[in-house]
Design a protein with these regions (language model features):
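Second-shell loop/turn segments in exported
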Residues: 49-50, 116-124, 143-152
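A eukaryotic "domain-start" boundary segment
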Residues: 27-40
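Glycine-rich catalytic cores of cysteine/serine-nucleophile enzymes that process amide/ester linkages
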Residues: 37-115
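Activation targets extended, charge/polar-rich intrinsically disordered C-terminal tails
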Residues: 139-354, 361-408
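Extracellular structured ligand-interaction cores
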Residues: 58, 71, 120-122, 158, ...
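Short, charged, amphipathic alpha-helices and their helix-cap/turn boundaries
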Residues: 128-137
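Residues embedded in well-ordered secondary-structure elements
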Residues: 14, 32, 49-52
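Bacterial Sec-dependent N-terminal signal peptides
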Residues: 1-28, 404-408
Length: 408
């Protein structure tokens, strides 16, 4: 969820120091275990940013040794936005992220510049658990281990940080679960992108049926703030010991700056507004066509072309590695078959005839409406469906009324 860091030389030196300390700690002695008393390990939760990849916040780990002065941030959200074909690779679930270790001071500098807040939860760990986490981070930081296959819902900066901490606790971590609170991936994402209507629209356009299924508490922890909230009330159950809070203390390392209140044109001109205006114009044109008994085939050409191209994108998403996008009922509306039937529709329209491709499109649109019971669609999609259904109906009515015949 973050850009590739600057100061690569500093990062490299920091990793060397961290690795040296950790390798020494692997040969654990009672004294070295005692040295862990000065080590604090915390979960860092960062507030959302302005860029699309930072809308949902960020999670990192802090390792601070008060005795040596070593203070580093462990970040599982490093990527290079300028990598060739980054956006397509991200969309199709082919993007690689990597883990990086660098001075906590640099970590805070970036968030200060971006006006984002940082909350640290210091984790209640034993000496051995601290040592195990440091050794695991050392192993993870090796060049052959630091790169991982990113998945927004299942394997991201939050899940990696959670697993690094929880998997090295010698006991069981119990979370407080509210059975009355259920949520889907789509609803949870909306909590963070609903103030950005076009980003929200694009996300909803790609998410399919599986994004509307109920999630478990563990699945909900893909969001940084959800993980923070889960940790805040979690208990650690160690053998022959009373349960203790997972989080020893919480403090705000950096206050978030108040967001800018100035709204842009696209905050008002939302996808729903844009689609509504388009639909109104199309309906007005259809009324004119009905009275003049003449089809403006250019409208159908433009709509089918755009519809088919958008449908082609949804078709390609079937092959995406993201598990929540492959089954998407919106493909019944944004239909790649529009490109296949485009020639027939326009050819027959120019001859004053009706193409039965339009009948097939109308059936798909009706199935799309039924799909509302199974999937939440992107904002304005049902209005767009009415717009396209209007084109199917007006073509049928005008051609049938004018020629009283249907032709293939």
């Amino acid at each position: 969820m973050k850009r590739l860091k600057r100061h690569l030389q500093v990062v490299f030196l920091t990793v060397l120091v961290f690795l040296t300390t950790s390798i020494r700690a692997q040969e654990a002695t009672p004294r070295q275990l005692q040295e862990m008393d000065s080590v604090e390990i915390g979960l860092l939760t960062c507030s959302p940013g302005k860029e699309i990849y930072s809308l949902y916040g960020h999670t990192a780990i802090r390792v601070h040794d008060a005795a040596t002065g070593q203070d580093v941030a462990v970040n599982y959200g490093l990527f290079n936005y300028h990598t060739p074909h980054f956006i397509p690779r991200f969309v199709f679930g082919l993007c690689d992220y990597e883990m990086g270790i660098y001075p906590f001071e640099l970590f805070m500098e970036e968030y200060t510049e971006e006006g984002r807040g940082v909350i640290e939860q210091r984790i209640n760990l034993t000496r051995q658990e601290k040592l195990d986490i440091i050794n695991a981070l050392t192993f993870n930081a090796r060049p052959k281990n630091k790169v991982y296959h990113y998945n927004f819902f299942y394997d991201n900066c939050s899940s990696r940080a959670r697993d690094m901490i929880v998997d090295h606790i010698h006991g069981h971590v119990g979370y407080r679960v509210n059975a009355s609170v259920t949520s889907s991936y789509r609803v949870m994402v909306h909590q963070w992108d609903e103030q950005h209507p076009w980003d929200c629209f694009g996300c909803d356009l790609l998410l399919g049926v599986n994004a509307d299924r109920k999630t478990t508490l563990r699945q909900q922890q893909f969001l940084p703030d959800s993980l923070r909230a889960s940790f805040a009330t979690a208990k650690v159950f160690r053998e022959h010991q009373p349960p203790v809070n997972l989080v020893d203390s919480t403090w705000t390392a950096l206050e978030a700056q108040a967001p800018e209140t100035d709204s842009s044109f696209f905050d008002v001109f939302t996808p729903r507004v844009a689609i509504s205006i388009l639909t109104l114009l199309v309906v007005l044109a259809s009324v004119s066509e009905y009275h003049k008994k003449k089809i403006y085939w250019g409208i159908d050409l433009a709509l089918l072309l755009v519809d088919g191209l958008a449908g082609l994108v949804l078709f390609l998403m079937i092959f995406s590695k993201h598990p929540t996008v492959s089954l998407n009922l919106q493909i019944l509306l944004l239909n790649p078959l529009s490109l296949v039937g485009l020639y027939s529709v326009i050819k027959k329209s120019r001859r004053g005839q009706y193409s039965k491709w339009l009948t097939m499109f109308a059936v798909c649109i009706l199935l799309f409406f039924i799909g509302n019971f199974l999937q939440d669609y992107a904002s304005g999609m049902n209005i767009l469906a009415l717009c396209l259904l209007d084109r199917c109906i007006v073509n049928y009515v005008v051609r049938f009324k004018d020629n009283n015949v249907l032709t293939r």
